[in-house]
């Protein structure tokens, strides 16, 4: 009977299960449950594939650092710090990220590697704190040692290579005596004076060698002579000046303390009161001109009356003609001295007029020029023809 009862219950359960499935299927609940289960299974499978194929996070710089001895030592110090204060959660994150589950040294090994002796003072803190204390003590010792060295360097005088202390001698502010430079400057002065004297003597010889008996020279010749005197004067001044000394040599040079030499000594010229200022011979010994025609102030002025000048000129012409005729100078073939002052220096042909007529023509031209230029009377003075000297009518240099 028991077997029949069990068989009846099993049939009832099957019928009930069938009835339940049919009811749930008709209501749509069974299909929804199947879909949710199916989706959950697919999601679980996909997530499993992602976890398996996921690349682990690797820090290359940290990996290279931990491969060194110092890197492992630093990681061990940090891990020992976390273990000392029981920071388990932080340590649980630190070890996976750094991949240091193995290979880190304990406290005893770290103390031995760092040379730290475990004492009462060091047990109360992590090893990282002791390392920092020792670094600070070393820095203080170095700074105190450098300060002592700096003070010794400042207070101790510098030593020579032989070991002796050398005294520091400040630079002297007294200028050096330049005696040799002054000697050179003083040695150049006689040479400059000698050159100026030679130039002045050459000017005198050149002027004295010119013919003195010819009183009818052209105005162009007179201007050429004045230009040569001006050029010679500039040469004399330049030769006397010489090279300028330096500022250092000017202070102790005795040349600038001497008085200025007189014109007689500097230019070799001395005025002769016996000769008249208006004669032709006085032009040869005249001093070098300084500026323009201002040195001709000693000549007779041009403001005399025309009648007096005309009488004087006529008398001079008569005397010159008489002397030339007595000496027989007007007959031979002679050079025209006016051409000597020209650049071509050609020989002039024999003139049909006599020398006296040429002089008269020159004088007439000069008189006309003087009369037409009254505004330049103060600046220009005529020295071409003047009254002849009573001492000698004709002068000639004797070699």
Curated annotation (Swiss-Prot):
Gene3D superfamilies: 1.20.960.40. Residues 143-311, 328-357 are annotated as: Disordered. The modification Phosphoserine is found at residues 152, 156, 160, 202, 301, 326. Residues 245-256 have a biased composition (Acidic residues). GO terms for biological process: cell projection organization; microtubule anchoring. The modification Phosphothreonine is found at residue 143. One of its GO terms (cellular component) is cell projection. The modification Phosphotyrosine is found at residue 337. Keywords: Cell projection, Cilium biogenesis/degradation, Cytoplasm, Cytoskeleton, Phosphoprotein. It holds the Pfam family FOP_dimer. InterPro entries: FOP_dimerisation-dom_N, LisH. Residues 70-102 form the LisH domain. PROSITE patterns: LISH (PS50896). The keyword Nucleotide-binding does not apply. Residues 197-209, 286-302 have a biased composition (Low complexity). Signal peptide: none annotated. It is found in: Cytoplasm, Cytoskeleton, Microtubule organizing center, Centrosome; Cytoplasm, Cytoskeleton, Microtubule organizing center, Centrosome, Centriole; Cytoplasm, Cytoskeleton, Cilium basal body. Homodimer. Part of a ternary complex that contains CEP350, CEP43 and MAPRE1. Interacts directly with CEP350 and MAPRE1. Interacts with CEP19. Interacts (via N-terminus) with CEP350 (via C-terminus). Belongs to the CEP43 family. Required for anchoring microtubules to the centrosomes. Required for ciliation. This is Centrosomal protein 43. The lineage of its organism: Eukaryota, Metazoa, Chordata, Craniata, Vertebrata. The gene is CEP43.
């Amino acid at each position: 009977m028991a077997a029949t009862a069990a068989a009846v219950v099993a049939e009832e359960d099957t019928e009930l299960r069938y009835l339940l499935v049919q009811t749930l299927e008709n209501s749509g609940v069974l299909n929804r449950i199947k879909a949710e289960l199916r989706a959950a299974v697919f999601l679980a499978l996909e997530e499993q594939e992602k976890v398996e194929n996921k690349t682990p996070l690797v820090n290359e710089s940290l990996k290279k650092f931990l491969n060194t001895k110092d890197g492992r030592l630093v990681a061990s110090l940090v891990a020992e710090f976390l273990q000392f204060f029981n920071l388990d959660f932080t340590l649980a994150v630190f070890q996976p990220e750094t991949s240091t589950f193995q290979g880190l040294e304990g406290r005893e090994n770290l103390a031995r590697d760092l040379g730290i002796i475990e004492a009462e003072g060091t047990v109360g803190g992590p090893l990282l704190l002791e390392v920092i204390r020792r670094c600070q003590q070393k820095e203080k010792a170095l700074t105190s040692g450098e300060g002592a060295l700096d003070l010794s360097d400042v207070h101790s005088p510098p030593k020579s290579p032989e070991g002796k202390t050398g005294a520091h001698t400040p630079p002297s502010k007294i200028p050096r005596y330049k005696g040799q430079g002054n000697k050179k400057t003083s040695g150049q002065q006689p040479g400059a004076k000698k050159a100026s004297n030679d130039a002045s003597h050459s000017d005198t010889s050149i002027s004295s060698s010119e013919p003195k008996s010819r009183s009818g020279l052209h105005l162009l010749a007179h201007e050429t002579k004045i230009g040569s005197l001006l050029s010679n004067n500039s040469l004399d001044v330049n030769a006397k000046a010489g090279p300028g000394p330096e500022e250092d040599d000017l202070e102790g040079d005795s040349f600038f303390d001497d008085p200025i030499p007189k014109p007689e000594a500097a230019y070799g010229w001395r005025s002769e009161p016996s000769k008249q200022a208006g004669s032709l011979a006085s032009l040869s010994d005249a001093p070098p001109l300084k500026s323009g025609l201002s040195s001709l102030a000693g000549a007779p002025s041009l403001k005399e009356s025309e009648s007096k000048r005309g009488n004087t000129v006529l008398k001079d012409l008569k005397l010159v003609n008489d002397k030339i005729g007595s000496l027989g100078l007007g007959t031979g073939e002679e050079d025209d001295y006016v051409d000597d002052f020209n650049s071509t220096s050609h020989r002039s042909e024999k003139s049909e007029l006599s020398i006296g007529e040429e002089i008269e023509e020159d004088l007439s031209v000069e008189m006309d020029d003087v009369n037409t230029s009254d505004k330049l009377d103060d600046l220009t003075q005529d020295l071409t023809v003047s009254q002849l000297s009573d001492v000698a009518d004709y002068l000639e240099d004797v070699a």
